[in-house]
Amino acid sequence: MAKYEILYIIRPNIEEEAKNALVARFDAVLTDNGATIVESKDWEKRRLAYEIQDFREGLYHVINVETEDAHALNEFDRLSKINNDILRHMIVKLDA
């Protein structure tokens, strides 16, 4: 299985309840498409290097995941691009 790390930045003015629902929904996107989540954790609210959609800071969330194919990652990528609560995301393949 290939190992990946997903980092995404959530808009800072989101309510705690909505943030938890967003994280649960995107974790479910991965698991429903065949990926195994090793770890899913919040980092912290951090200042951004430059403004993104008029925000100067964002809530960082990191997911470590294992998957056989890229279907789950492609679906995560597609949905995170159209979600207004996610400012940016990045998927990186980890060394085995």
Swiss-Prot record:
Instruction: Indicate the secretion signal residues.
Output: none
Cited Gene3D superfamilies: 3.30.70.60
UniProt keywords (A-Z) are: Ribonucleoprotein, Ribosomal protein, RNA-binding, rRNA-binding
Q: Which Pfam families match?
A: Ribosomal_S6 (PF01250)
A GO BP entry is: translation
GO CC, sorted alphabetically, is: cytoplasm; ribonucleoprotein complex; ribosome
The record's SUPFAM superfamilies line, in alphabetical order, gives: Ribosomal protein S6
Gene Ontology MF annotations: small ribosomal subunit rRNA binding; structural constituent of ribosome
PANTHER family reported in the protein's UniProt record: MITOCHONDRIAL 28S RIBOSOMAL PROTEIN S6, SMALL RIBOSOMAL SUBUNIT PROTEIN BS6M
Sequence similarity: Belongs to the bacterial ribosomal protein bS6 family.
What this protein is reported to do is described as: Binds together with bS18 to 16S ribosomal RNA.
Q: What is this protein called?
A: Small ribosomal subunit protein bS6
Q: Which organism is it from?
A: Streptococcus mutans serotype c (strain ATCC 700610 / UA159)
